[in-house]
């Protein structure tokens, strides 16, 4: 297997999510199971076994001539060459209706670190709004992996419109001595929250909508971005949710002061958001960011929230 894409052009979404390498693939598998409204999922890897075991229907094996399907051996240069070997396949997949793509990868290994910047550059060169969501390694994974991650982040930063960097190492600081699988699971949840939060601003019809052009204006060539999410219910739920969002523990440097653009998506459940709550959220964020920041704000219903509100 080298190339399996099941996307009829008339049914393809304008938003694609591509998981690159082992870490990116695991994250996108998780996203796929959790569900993100109105996006198409892809997985891209040198490792044929990882592709075979993934539930994602759209799979691109890269670098088969180079690695014979055995992975990149933690060598980013192999990952880069593998992506270049199959760049036409990647471009062909992205050419189906795509206006926005999320590229997720774990930085520090071979395929994700090396291939993700190549794929991102191809997407951006096609005029697609390109958003990178990447993780940095745990310190215990070793200095060499951390160094590779640093260089990988510098490379992908040059190839995307917007980059979100999620620190795996902060998981241990915040949550303590977790089982390994649970620690990586927390990171997958944050990746999912980031992609879902941005994509569903566009794809879910709400009481107040943010359209694709608003998102494009906010994120085109915006550099490093940050994101947070909060959920609360009961008294003062709106302010507690927005404060949680601004203190999201797994995103580095989550300060919005001086930001030029803010995308704000608030959702409510059975208890509809009031005008005062909507105003509280947006006015608080405007004050935190500064009066020069442009806010694009959406509001929608989510039947899973009960009496809660999310920001």
Predicted feature locations:
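Tubulin/FtsZ superfamily GTPase core signature
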Residues: 1-311
């Amino acid at each position: 297997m080298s190339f399996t894409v099941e996307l009829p052009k008339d049914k393809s979404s304008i938003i694609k999510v591509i998981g690159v390498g082992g870490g990116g693939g695991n994250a996108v598998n998780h996203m796929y199971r959790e569900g993100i409204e109105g996006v198409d999922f892809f997985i891209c890897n040198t490792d044929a076994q990882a592709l075979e075991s993934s539930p994602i229907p759209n799979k691109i094996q890269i670098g088969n001539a180079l690695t014979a399907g055995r992975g990149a051996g933690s060598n980013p240069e192999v990952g880069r060459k593998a992506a270049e070997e199959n760049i036409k396949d990647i471009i062909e997949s992205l050419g189906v209706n795509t206006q926005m793509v999320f590229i997720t990868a774990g930085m520090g290994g071979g395929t994700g670190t090396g291939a993700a910047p190549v794929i991102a550059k191809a997407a951006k060169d096609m005029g697609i709004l390109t958003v990178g969501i990447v993780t940095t390694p745990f310190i215990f994974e070793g200095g060499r992996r951390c160094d590779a991650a640093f260089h990988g982040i510098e490379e992908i930063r040059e190839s995307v419109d917007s980059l979100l960097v999620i620190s795996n190492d902060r998981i241990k600081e915040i949550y303590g001595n977790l089982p390994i699988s649970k620690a990586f699971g927390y990171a997958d949840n944050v990746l999912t929250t980031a992609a879902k939060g941005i994509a569903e601003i566009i794809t879910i019809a709400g009481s107040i909508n943010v359209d694709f052009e608003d998102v494009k204006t906010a994120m085109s060539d915006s550099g490093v971005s940050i994101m947070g999410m909060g959920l609360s219910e009961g008294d003062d739920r709106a302010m507690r949710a927005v404060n949680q969002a601004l203190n999201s523990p797994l995103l580095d440097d989550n300060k919005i002061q001086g930001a030029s653009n803010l995308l704000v998506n608030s959702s409510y459940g059975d208890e509809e958001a009031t005008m005062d709550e909507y105003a509280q959220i947006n006015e608080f964020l405007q004050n935190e960011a500064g009066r020069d920041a442009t806010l694009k704000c959406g509001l929608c219903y989510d039947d899973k929230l009960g009496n809660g509100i999310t920001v």
